Amino acid sequence: MMKKDSDSIFPNRRTLQERNQTRKRMVAHVLRAQFKKEFKTCRILVGNHFFTVDLMSNDDEIAAKIINPGITSHNKMSSGKFQQILSSIMILKSIDSKRKLLIFTNKKMYENFCASISSMPTPICDTVNGIEIAWIPLSDEFDNYEHSEPATDFRINQDIFGRARK
């Protein structure tokens, strides 16, 4: 009979999951302060598949997907991460919430995504129409293990596109 190891063969996986949960709590704190609503994680049915919405207001009017850091060693966003973000946008677009937020927790990721999406062909660039892209500055400090209090700054659609993407 085989015995399960008590130690994970992926020791960083648990740490990463814990860090992402901490980021989610911090973002929920900022959204609660910004919108005066409670937020929770929920699973929704889209077609015949269930998807996780990172944060949904209790009245279902605001849905948010959180984009955590994922920069390569060359300070670029990988194509896999870019595709993951596009997938998150498609899920947000399929939800009936009035406001749909794509929230970055790292300034470099936010800037890289905005620069990348604005330079894409129209079909890809237009995927962000109807989505509010925001940056909540916490991961720059948090990634260095120095963040202590939840950030309260919430920056939606800074003028990277030259026009608001709503």
Residue ranges: model-predicted function:
Residues M2, L86, M90, A115-K166:
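Non-catalytic C-terminal interaction segments of nucleic acid-processing enzymes
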Residues M2-V46:
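Acidic-basic catalytic patches of nuclease active cores, encompassing PD-(D/E)XK
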Residues A33-Q34, S94-K98, T127:
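Alpha-helix C-cap/termination motif
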Residues K40-I44, F50-D54, K76-M77, L86-I91:
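Short secondary-structure capping micro-motifs at structural edges
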Residues R43-I44, I103-K107, I136-D140:
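Acidic carboxylate-rich catalytic motifs and surrounding loops in phosphoryl-/glycosyl-chemistry enzymes
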Residues G47-N48, M56-N58, S94-S97:
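Flexible, charged surface loops at secondary-structure boundaries
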Residues F51-N68:
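Active-site beta-strand-loop-beta-strand hairpin of nuclease catalytic cores
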Residues I66-P121:
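Catalytic cores of nucleic-acid endonucleases
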